[in-house]
Amino acid sequence: MATTSRRPVLTRAKVIVPVLLAVALVIAFVAIFTRLYTDLLFYRSVDFSKVFTTVIYTRILLFLIFGAVMAVVIGTNIVLGYRFRPQLRPLSTEQQNLERYRSAIEPYMKLVLVAVAAVFGLAAGLSASGRWRTWLLWVNGESFGTKDPQFHRDISYYAFTYPFQRFLLGFLLTAVLLSLLVTVLTHYLFGGIRLQTPGERVTPAAKAHISVLLGLLALLKAWAYYLDRFGSVFSSRGVATGASYTDVHAVLPAKLILLFISLACAVLFIYNIFQRGWTLPLLGAGILVLSSVVIGGIYPAFIQQFQVRPNEATREQPYIERNIAATRAAYGIQNVKPQSYAARTDVTAAQVAADTGTVPNTRLLDPSKLSRTFQQLQQIRGYYTFPKTLDVDRYTVTGADKKQTTRDYVVSVRELNQAGLGADQRNWINEHLTYTHGKGFVAAPSNTVDEGQPAFDEGEQNLPQKGDFDVRENRVYFGEMSPNYSVVGTRQVEIDGPGPGADTQVTTTYTGDGGVSIGSTFRQALFALRFGEKNLLLSGDITKNSRILYERNPRDRVSKAAPWLTLDGDPYPAVVNGRITWILDGYTTSDGYPYSARRTLGDVTADSVTAQSGNRARQAANQVNYIRNSVKATVDAYDGTVTLYAWDESDPVLRTWMKAFPDTVKPKKDISPSLMAHLRYPEDLFKVQRDLIGQYHVSDPRDFYSQEDFWQVSESPDGSGQPQPPFYVYSKLPDRSGPSYNLTSPLISARSSKLAAYMAVSSDPSNYGQFTLLKLPPGGTINGPVQVQNAIESNGDVANKLTLWRGAGSQTIEGNLLTLPVAGGLLYVEPYYVQARGGSGYPTLQGIATAFGERIGFGTSLGEALDKVFGSGAGAAAAGAGTGATTTTGGGGQATTQGGGTGAAPPGGTSGLQDAVNDADSAYKAGQDALRKNPPDFNAYGQAQTDLADALSRLRTLASPPTTPPAASPTPSRSAAPTTRGTAAGSAPPGTTPAVAAPAGPSGPPSPAGATAGPPQQPRAAPPPG
């Protein structure tokens, strides 16, 4: 009965298990096919299908080759172990126990053999397929045209061939070791190895089999020692990267000796086939291990300790020279030469006023601090947003005087923010068919403000787009904040921003070629599987003309189109030929440049901005010792077109990848002038180079060894503990005839916080990549950024202002602390923004601090702050660069005034606020005077504190936003005729508390808080149409 009851169970198990396996295989196949096919459709949509097929074919080839080799090797050794099994086995407890396993396995021996070989082959094939980059570099490697100084081999051997040889060696070692393992197990299972049986413990056949494998292992070890010799050029044993004195005079000879010992051991293992016992193999293995310890370890350590250490500077000198030359060449800094810069501190007001190349262009808007300001002033609708960190670019525009001037702007695009939709609007149709794109390019001159707010030249609080940049297509379907996917060209119209009425919307239908056609049921089903959304298959709104947009982040699109590139972490938008275009910098890297110092990209490119920014990607923790900005990439914001341009056509790594992926990178000559005008020196590359310049500006090996003149990147003065980021500024450098668009960074001494150097590189097409490295006198006294920040905030005037602002219910935000070469010295400039605490405020510029030497100045404009440092007239070139009305300054430093209104009145009325500020200032001074008396007058001090508290209370009341903000219209009112704005119109008096903005509603832009309490607000005039 028991047997009968089990039969149905066993029968069901025999049916269910294969069915479940079949279903699992079908699901896996469908999932893999769906992903691969939809990826192929993406690559076809951007005309990079050759990249997809090349990578897939290469991975399949590697999978088949290495998987098959591993499977055959493992399977062959199992077969040999089984075939060479003894026919008769001595009777013992061990063999009796093993017999049960033999009886269970032998009927299914072929199945076991195939299964074991398949498992190892599958694992090896999958592992090898991931090394497609190594394979393609080896197959297509181009010459560097430079040889290493030790072995005189072309650098391409170390960059392309050596990594593949190492991979192949590792694979073969793994195959032989696994073969040895399965061979020993097979012989043990079938009686060829008997551990607990008297007499012969290993049969001759098993001994021969194992001896051959051990001989192969010794041969591979000899090859490993041979490759180790070339690997010494990456050694970190000495003072600098590369083969050191000990490596050349001890390690290399030791590796050669160990190579021959390994060959001798291989001979002994093979010879052991004809000998009894294991004496010879054990002797050989013992000699190899002992030699590795003595010759490979103790001897080099002895040389290092007793020959090198006592005379290390002299012994290592030629190898340090090699490292310096190789590192400078590998990172593209071989032509960066320090030039002496006195950094004067005895500068007059007239000399500062005469510096019209830098002072008028000083950046006052910090792109990492003003996202909230752009959001409040330019959001327009709740379903639009701006990234956390804005970007900087430069544009040449025609001013009111018909002259063209170039200046830098803080720029961004108005991206789609579906999180801003109401709860009743969150449905699949709205999120994927209706709200599909952002709209608008927004730009504000970085050196200009209007009542503390950006003076937008492009992207005013209205659509369609108006401004100076001739934006003809401003829809953003591909952006940093775009949804995962959208379906366009459906029966649903797309929301395209606010209409002319208060509650109206403009609609549109996508007409571009971007994305993938999704008209067929087959494709709809595939994308429904990919995105896990049944509506893609069932929706009646999708037609034969519909297209699905996915992989929409510009960085992701370029990364898929060029998977061999390392991309800069900061894509930025620009207006190119009337279209919004994302620009990205692509790097070719290698870790195979002999003698070059290695850096971890994720470490050296991290700073205080990347640590806090949500839209700047951090580099991976990849070690490199060679890098080039070899590719400039663009992504069209409307149709997603990806274009790659060869920027450094001499780069051998780029040439190698172009050979592997032909016709995917366009030549440099195809870059249009409109695009060329917006290319800039990449930030991540500059961070790597400035880190290296801190050491490798030293060319003398003895000085390099002493490390006395090493520099480092300063900590950010914001207290984050991260390195200070570099800054893009439009400025005139001492070795240039005029202002240029530069990426800059100060460097401090590695032994103190004093400023040691100033580093800048140009982004202008005429002198792109030209470095300026200003070296300050040794033992200088110019403070570094952190020291300057402390000095500014401990200054009495600054402390007073900060106390008043913070006491009035607001918080202060320090902007970027810029270091600028001005009038033969170094000027620090830091804007101060103020915003109300809570969710309704946004930062407005209310003060500017300057520092020069030991002198600190603070004012409501840059000119005022400069006058306080240098004396009257110093700030003439910076007229208007501050918190007052809009005044723009051209590259030549001549100020031109734009038409418009006087700007918003402070909440609560100007006179009431000013009275409160004056009373607070007087009370504070009275208290300080009372304390300075001898003895202190504490009665007077107490009365002063009471008066101060009363003044601050009035300030809080006047500055508080209204509890119910007034309704906002979608389009700001415009004045009938523009009025002239002078530098005095609407200027914020010293100590004025900034206006606080109420949050923008879904139907329009924000309104100034407290507007009902003050005088009527005069509207700002619209800029002339672009």
From Swiss-Prot:
Residue ranges, compositional bias (Pro residues): 1016-1026
GO cellular component terms attached to this protein's record: extracellular region; plasma membrane
Main localisation: membrane
Biased composition (Low complexity): 877-888, 970-1001
Membrane-crossing segments per the record: 13-33, 60-80, 108-128, 167-187, 208-228, 250-270, 283-303
Cellular location(s): Cell membrane
Membrane topology category: Multi-pass membrane protein
Spans annotated as Disordered: 877-916, 958-1026
Alphabetical UniProt keywords: Cell membrane, Membrane, Transmembrane, Transmembrane helix
Gly residues bias spans: 889-903
One matching Pfam family: UPF0182
NCBIfam families to which the protein is assigned, alphabetical: PRK00068.1
Family the entry assigns: Belongs to the UPF0182 family.
Protein name from the UniProt record: UPF0182 protein FRAAL6027
